[in-house]
Amino acid sequence: MSSMKIAIAGASGRMGRMLIEAVLAAPDATLAGALDRTGSSQLGQDAGAFLGKQTGVALTDDIERVCAEADYLIDFTRPEGTLAHLDAALRHDVKLVIGTTGFSEPQKAQLRAAGGKIALVFSANMSVGVNVTMKLLEFAAKQFAQGYDIEIIEAHHRHKVDAPSGTALMMGETIAAATGRTLDDCAVYGRHGVTGERDPSTIGFSAIRGGDIVGDHTVLFAGIGERIEITHKSASRVSYAQGALRAARFLAGHQAGFFDMQDVLGLR
């Protein structure tokens, strides 16, 4: 397999730096571009400076140039930025790995439509462990569909800007689909004041923000006389970066299509 020419969006951020480190360490990948936001004080710096390495790739805000030089773009940024990058990727036939969260349903529809022209993987969480957890939740939801209250509790660092997390929503969507519903039909986001008794048909969400928590997710199936908890905890962002590279390798075999990590891992 020839070396994958990969560009990283949000290259100066926490996740972007982890992705750059992963690409530089991968024997089958080459860092082809490092995209940062317009106005960043780090524009023009070498993308490997934070590692004490010279990559020869400078941080830039020129998405057209980045897409002209790369075959793959890995994007963990924000919805508006990702959609702008998507337009450029479509023009240059660049394959996309998208880990951005916080998309609206119409924005997600744009991503799905793009799969008719280019190959892309979109997942709120690229971790192999999280995606295996989704299969466990699918099985558990069918067994506990009656007589168990379902709550999803997630915790992240103080800098995270969206809530609930994309992973928590993905968990809720998995559970809802396994029980013949849509998440919009049954989700309850936080509780406050006099709420009355719990509606047993709902899926509750609670979000915690604090410190440097990378990402903790627990799904609670609470019955009478017992409760079952399925938990995934991320100790670092390494698992996300490795999952993103795995997604890029998967896309090497596809010219077009909209995929997620369940496809990448063969869990369908």
Swiss-Prot record:
Protein origin, superkingdom: Bacteria
Gene3D superfamilies (alphabetical): Dihydrodipicolinate Reductase, domain 2, NAD(P)-binding Rossmann-like Domain
Residue numbers binding NADP(+): 37
Alphabetically ordered keywords of this record: Amino-acid biosynthesis, Cytoplasm, Diaminopimelate biosynthesis, Lysine biosynthesis, NAD, NADP, Oxidoreductase
Active site per database record: 156, 160
Gene Ontology biological process terms from the UniProt entry: diaminopimelate biosynthetic process; lysine biosynthetic process via diaminopimelate
Alphabetized InterPro entries for the sequence: DapB_C, DapB_N, DapB_N_CS, DHDPR_bac, NAD(P)-bd_dom_sf
Enzyme Commission number(s): 1.17.1.8
Catalytic activity from the UniProt record: (S)-2,3,4,5-tetrahydrodipicolinate + NAD(+) + H2O = (2S,4S)-4-hydroxy-2,3,4,5-tetrahydrodipicolinate + NADH + H(+); (S)-2,3,4,5-tetrahydrodipicolinate + NADP(+) + H2O = (2S,4S)-4-hydroxy-2,3,4,5-tetrahydrodipicolinate + NADPH + H(+)
Sample GO molecular function, one term: 4-hydroxy-tetrahydrodipicolinate reductase
GO cellular component, one term: cytosol
Presence of keyword NADP: yes
Pfam families given in the database record: DapB_C, DapB_N
SUPFAM superfamilies: Glyceraldehyde-3-phosphate dehydrogenase-like, C-terminal domain, NAD(P)-binding Rossmann-fold domains
Subcellular location: Cytoplasm
Residue positions binding NAD(+): 10-15, 36, 99-101, 123-126
Residues given in the record as (S)-2,3,4,5-tetrahydrodipicolinate binding sites: 157, 166-167
Pathway: Amino-acid biosynthesis; L-lysine biosynthesis via DAP pathway; (S)-tetrahydrodipicolinate from L-aspartate: step 4/4
Role according to the record: Catalyzes the conversion of 4-hydroxy-tetrahydrodipicolinate (HTPA) to tetrahydrodipicolinate.
NCBIfam families: dapB
Protein family membership: Belongs to the DapB family.
HAMAP family: DapB (MF_00102)
Name of the protein in question: 4-hydroxy-tetrahydrodipicolinate reductase
Organism field: Burkholderia mallei (strain ATCC 23344)
